[in-house]
C-alpha cells in the first residue's frame, strides 16, 4: 500500500502544458501563441501558489514530522476528559488494582477472578461476544455529557473509539456486527459526541487501539508477532483512515503499540496523512511503536513529569481504572483535594491532565465521577487565569517531606502505579519494614525478594539480600502486563521458635511498583513470609506483621506564569498565616492578591523570601477549597 503523498501540482502542470501546446498548435496563429502561452503559465502558477499558500504538506518521515510545531491550543488547554465506554462496561468488574477495560484479556489468559465472576453473574456458557446486545446505552445523551465536560473546565474531550477488544463506537464497515450501529445502542456514538462537544466550544479527540486481542487476522498477545502484517494492511490502516476522515478529530491518541516498532504500524505515514488532512490544529500522542520518539507525552498513573520540551498530559482515571470497575473501593477514588492538587502540580510542571470517566453500560456517568468533575470546574472558575495558557515559572514547585506508618501483615504488594497510601506519592517513595521473624523449623532458609525497584533484607543484622538498583522503565502504556522483576535470593540458618531482628528496605522510582518476600527450606514449603511468623515488636505474643514507614516528597506550593504575572498556588493554608514564597525581590509597586477575593494583601521581603501576610483574610472570604492562588502582579 502506497502511503507517499502525491504531488498533484506537477501532474496538473504537465497536463495543462500539454493541453495548451495542442490547442495553440492547432487553432492559434504563431504570433498569438507566443503571447498567449506565457500569460496562461503565469495565471496557472499564480493560482497553484495561492492554492498551496499557508498549507504545508508533511512527508511520511520523522524528520518532516519533527519540523512541525505542536499546536498552541493543546499547550494552553491543560484539561481534557478521557472516556472509556465499551462492552467491558457491562460486566464493569476486575481486580481492585486492575483496569476494567481489560476484562476480555483476563478471560483470554485464564484470570480465574474474572472468569468466575462472568460465570456466576452471566452464566456458565456466556462469552464476551454476548455482552454486545447488553451494551444498550439507553441513557446516553451526548449533549448532557458535553455539558458536564464543559462545566468541568475541560478544553478537549478524548473518546475511546475502539479499545483492544475491537468493538467500535462508530459504524465501521471494517467491523461488521461489532460496532454500536449494528449491535448494542444502534447509534453512532462517535458522531453524536463529536457534534455535541464541538458545539460547546471544546476540541474533539479520538483514542484508537492499533492492535486487537481478538481479530481473526491477528490476535494480539496470542498469535506470533510476525503475523501482524496482514492485519495492519487489510484492517487497521483502512479502518483508521475511515475513522479519521469521517470525524476529523483535533487529537489522536493511539495505544497498544508496545510489541512492535513504528514501522510495523506505518506510524509516520499515518501521522503525516492525518496532519495533511486536518491541518494545523491536529496533534497526536506518543504511542506509535518502537523507534517513534514523537508526539505529546502521556505518562499514565504516575506522579507526572518534571520537565519536557514536548507538551504532555498525565492520563489516569478518577479511581484505579479507566473503564468502570464496580469492584473498586471508595478509598480508591480521588478526593476533590487529590484531584485539584494532582491537576495543579501537572500544570506547574508544564503539562496538564486528561482525567478519565467510565460510564455505566446504560450511558450514565456515575454520580461520584460527575461530582468530582464539577468540583474541579468550580475551582477553575475562581482560579482559571493561573491555569489556562500558563507557562512554567523558574521554580515550578516547592516540596516537603511526608510519611505515614502502619503495621503490614506481610510484604506482598503489587501497587501497580498507585501510591501505597496518602500522603506518599505514586513514584519516588521508600518503605522500611522492621520487627522480628520467628521460623517454624531449624533449617537453612532460602529467602527470595522480588521488587520494582530496589530491595534489601537484613536478618539478625546480616545482609541476606541486596538488590539496590532501579529497574529499567517500560512504556507508559503497558501497565496491566508489565513484566515482574527478577527475584534475588539469599540463605541464612535459623532456629525454630527463636525471634530474629528483621529489616527490609525498599525504594520505587517510576511506573510500576511491587515488593514480595518469600521463604522456603527443606521443611518449609515456599510461601510469602506469613503474618503468623512476623512481629512488630518483642512484646507481641502473636504474629501481627512488621512496622512499616513509608516516605516521599510532597508538593506544598506550585507556580505558574501568565500574561507577565506570577501565580503562587498553595496546596495548604499556612498555619501561621504567613505565606512564604522563594522568589526574587519583586519590583516596586508589585501587588499580591488572593484570586476570588477583592483587595490586595500586605507583603514584605526578608532573607531572599517574599512573605505574604494572610491574617486579613477571613474564613468567610475564602473563595474556594483545596488550593489557593495568589497573584503576584507587576
Roles of regions detected by a PLM:
Residues 15, 445-448, 507, 580-585:
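Short linear motifs in intrinsically disordered
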Residues 52-398, 541-634:
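Mature catalytic domains of secreted/periplasmic carbohydrate-active enzymes
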Residues 399-551:
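Acidic/polar, compositionally biased interaction segments
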